[in-house]
């Protein structure tokens, strides 16, 4: 059996989890080949959850961080399919827990995407980076928000509190450290007293909670914190937001707030709101609130992608917070008027080209006239030469004395007198008639 066949059989045995077959094939010299997608035997064993097969392959020396055509490692495969025991085996054998595939997604991203809570906990336990961002600028926390998985959200938030993002990957990260407290969970339609909420937060932050630490986050939706500040009527302004007061509601634009807050997600059961301030602890908000300033309960709801805080009728009006836009619209700048200049330049270019073409046409016509005159002149000369030849031919009589001179190579001219010529003609006439002179002999008739 060839090596290629042995490699194919090894891939199939790893896919099916046939440990004995894998050992036999490796003993017979089967190479660690891959299929057309770059999938190795360890990839297949990790994908299909064959623990013993993966262990045999690792002991045999298969690369624990082998890459497919899309840069996925065996750890990616195991995490995506929820095989926690395979994940732990790979990590213990030195697999890169923060390896990224072609989409820049780590094993933690894939485990969060597929709702594998046990794999998420295991990866965080072995030091997975919870601040890593994918190609789409999403962390594992962002994916959990999209998937509405509250359990994984809490796990990731605790891990984010315990980790410090030394090298943020987003385009505009916040460089100032921010304080973060535990998440507040609001049930659908629940009425919460804001004063008690802030006091409980202040108690947690000042009591030295070991889960609270300094972390860094990027700019995100900030409308809820802006609403809290508006309700508190803080003396210290927290933003440069433009507020338009109406009789029954006040709208605060989210893009004018300088704080950070993660998105509010819910699946009909709970709403998870994570509030983060830019270096301003929540205790400072409480100190800036007048005594008895917040005694009104409020309701947190989500309507059509907007976060709405509804306050009962009283001193504080109902407020609707518009979701912060990611990009601020830049003012329109006046474009320079270059249309007229461009048109004039194009017209001048067209005029120059037209003049050049006319000049070339005139030059061509002039040359054609010259050639025509030259041709007529040549025809006239040829006609005159033909007439001369005809006249010469008519003027030559038969038997008249003539002079014929021909060039003979390497022979001097022969002079023949008229008497000698007559004698020769007489001799020849009697026998054969008239004889023409030699064509290559120069003859001249000289009168005696």
Curated annotation (Swiss-Prot):
Question: Where are the stretches annotated Disordered?
Answer: 325-354, 420-448
Q: Which SUPFAM superfamilies match?
A: Ankyrin repeat
Kindly list any coiled-coil regions of this protein: 345-395
List where in the cell it is found: Nucleus
Keywords from the named record: ANK repeat, Coiled coil, Nucleus, Phosphoprotein, Repeat, Transcription, Transcription regulation
Which stretches are tagged as biased composition: Basic and acidic residues? Answer: 337-354
Biased region (Polar residues) positions are: 428-448
The UniProt entry, under Pfam families, shows: Ank_2
One biological process term from GO is:
positive regulation of transcription by RNA polymerase II
Which residues get modified to Phosphoserine? 256
Q: Which branch of life, at top level?
A: Eukaryota
Q: Where are the ANK repeats?
A: 5-34, 37-66, 70-99, 103-132, 136-166
Q: Looking at the UniProt record for this protein, which Gene Ontology cellular component terms does it annotate, in alphabetical order?
A: nucleus
**A GO term for molecular function:** transcription cis-regulatory region binding
Record's function text = May function as transcription factor capable of interacting with purine rich repeats (GA repeats).
Q: How does it assemble?
A: Heterotetramer of two alpha and two beta subunits. The C-terminal is necessary for the formation of a heterotetrameric GABP-alpha-2/beta-2 complex, and also facilitates homotypic dimerization. Interacts with ADGRB2.
Protein name (database record): GA-binding protein subunit beta-2
Q: Which gene encodes it?
A: GABPB2
